[in-house]
């Protein structure tokens, strides 16, 4: 059987506004094993959950996260852009997301850097310590030195490197797991990573055939905007014979569904 984690990308971002408590709650409702979120520091040192460097996409506001106080950021509605039913959603704190997921799912904390971070790794560590959820978090970053720094502060955590392109041999990177664009995750790469003791998570996978193809290749986790679909694919595969699974992979190659999108950092990031 497949031993694959369903990792909800920015919460269940296909069904609710990304990185909000609504998307986190939906991810839990849809059976995510792991809830992935992005964190940054505000001007006054709060660790908040938001992907972009400003609030234009989610709030129609050019306010930059590192220049604004937590209260200023909290005043912005970051739900109505997605749908009127989400009006009133606010940028949550890391602590709020951790409390929402307590005892229900692992939280994958992606450390975001836009050149203005001060103590992000230490502050994240302190918040997790304060909530007593050290055994329920993992962390990752696009920056290799941030991975090393976070691992230095929290050697007991699984800390991973996130990447959209192969630079050298990633399997030798100082990281516990590799979160790679789906286009990089060929069978040879996955095998080398596993030989090096590293799990492989792929992002961002939002269609059935790609999900099934990645599961057949032996990835350890699928990062998706649609955790309910990933859970359904896992359930369907559990009922399939090996031949039926091969037919699903064949369907991908003859073009029954679109192949993976080009590697674009904003797909994850």
Predicted regions and their residues:
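Phosphate-group recognition and catalysis centered on beta-loop-alpha active-site segments
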Residues: 1-269
């Amino acid at each position: 059987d497949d031993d694959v984690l369903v990792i909800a990308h920015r919460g269940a971002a296909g069904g609710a506004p990304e990185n909000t408590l609504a998307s986190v709650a939906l991810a839990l409702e849809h059976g995510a094993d792991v809830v992935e979120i992005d964190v940054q520091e505000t001007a006054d040192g709060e660790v908040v959950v938001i992907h972009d460097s400003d609030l234009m996409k989610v709030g129609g506001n050019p306010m930059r996260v590192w220049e604004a106080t937590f209260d200023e950021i909290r005043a912005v509605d970051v739900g109505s852009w997605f749908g009127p039913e989400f009006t009133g959603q606010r940028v949550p704190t890391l602590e709020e997301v951790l409390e929402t997921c307590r005892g229900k799912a692992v939280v994958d904390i992606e450390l975001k850097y836009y050149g203005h971070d001060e103590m992000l790794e230490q502050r994240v560590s302190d918040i997790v310590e304060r909530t007593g959820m050290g055994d329920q978090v993992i962390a990752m970053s696009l920056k290799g030195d941030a991975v090393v720094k976070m691992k230095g502060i929290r050697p007991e955590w699984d800390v991973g490197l996130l990447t959209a392109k192969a630079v050298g041999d990633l399997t030798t990177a100082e990281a516990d797991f590799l979160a790679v664009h789906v286009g990089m995750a060929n069978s040879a790469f996955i095998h080398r990573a596993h030989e090096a003791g590293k799990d492989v998570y792929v992002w961002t996978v939002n269609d059935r055939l790609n999900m099934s193809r990645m599961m057949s290749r032996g990835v350890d986790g699928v990062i998706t905007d649609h955790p309910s679909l990933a859970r359904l694919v896992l359930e369907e595969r559990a009922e399939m014979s090996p031949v039926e699974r091969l037919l699903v992979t064949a369907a991908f190659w003859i073009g029954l569904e679109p192949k993976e999108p080009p590697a674009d950092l904003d797909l994850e990031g």
